UniProtKB/Swiss-Prot annotation:
It comes from Thermotoga neapolitana (strain ATCC 49049 / DSM 4359 / NBRC 107923 / NS-E). The keyword Hydrolase applies. It holds the Pfam family Lactamase_B_2. This is UPF0173 metal-dependent hydrolase CTN_1413. GO terms for molecular function: hydrolase activity. Coiled coil: none annotated. Belongs to the UPF0173 family. It comes from the Bacteria. Keywords: Hydrolase.
Length: 226
């Protein structure tokens, strides 16, 4: 299984089925690819309704006849745009043809900006994805929460955690999150896209590895194999 970081919080998972999480491609200053560069996508996972996460979900879904997995409200919004969806909510899990997805809590917002209006986008979340014998945790946008302690029991293989501060956890809180989750690997995300979310990623790596957890800093476009 190949996992590619596409910048900000966008992650491409290529295996027996191809998944993309938070597909912010167009307009993402950190993303090294264009929509036409993506492989065929089978499923799109959207953690919440903000534009830098909902991103190109509609265009990718229609081009690939892909299914969007998100919360109920976002799925209702996308369904009206002709997109195939599978609605979930926090704490719910479902076995798909590629593996199991569980929606986890996140502390953030989820409003969808539509012209001059903000549409209610339900509750933000993260995803615990079990596929091909591995577990991937994508936290979405979130502050530090004690709920993360429950993930320690899941034996997460790789955790994608936001570290950029201001809107999400900063480096210090993300380090605390790692101690709660105890993943085998952690990949920092949601930092450096814009100046307001600058983070000292090398400090994060140093502190995480002092805890005995491997920290993999992926530049946009780089991949790891699971």
């Amino acid at each position: 299984m190949k996992i590619t970081f596409l910048g900000h919080a966008a992650v491409l998972v290529e295996g027996k089925k191809n998944l993309i999480i938070d597909p912010f491609i167009t307009g993402n200053p950190a993303c090294p690819v264009k929509l036409e560069d993506l492989p065929k996508i089978d499923y799109i996972l959207v953690t919440h309704g903000h534009g830098d996460h909902l991103g190109d979900a509609v265009e990718i879904a229609k081009k690939n006849d892909a299914i969007v997995i998100s919360n109920y409200e976002i799925c209702q919004y996308l369904g009206k745009k002709g997109v195939k969806t599978h609605a979930m909510h926090i704490g719910g899990s479902y076995l798909f043809d590629f593996g199991r997805v569980k929606m986890t809590p996140a502390v953030h917002g989820s409003g969808i900006l539509d012209g001059e209006n903000i549409i209610y986008g339900g509750n933000p979340g993260g995803f615990l994805i079990t596929l091909e014998g591995k577990k991937i945790y994508h936290a979405g946008d979130t502050g530090l929460t004690k709920d993360m302690e429950l993930l320690k029991e899941e034996n997460v293989d790789v955790a994608f955690l936001p570290i950029g501060g201001n809107f999400v956890m900063d480096v210090e809180d993300a380090i605390r999150a790692v101690s709660m989750i105890s993943p085998r690997k952690v990949v920092p995300m949601h930092y450096g896209t814009w100046e307001i979310i600058f983070a000292d990623v090398e400090l994060f790596k140093k502190k995480v590895e002092e805890m005995g957890v491997e920290c993999v800093i992926l530049e946009p476009g780089e991949s790891l194999e699971l």
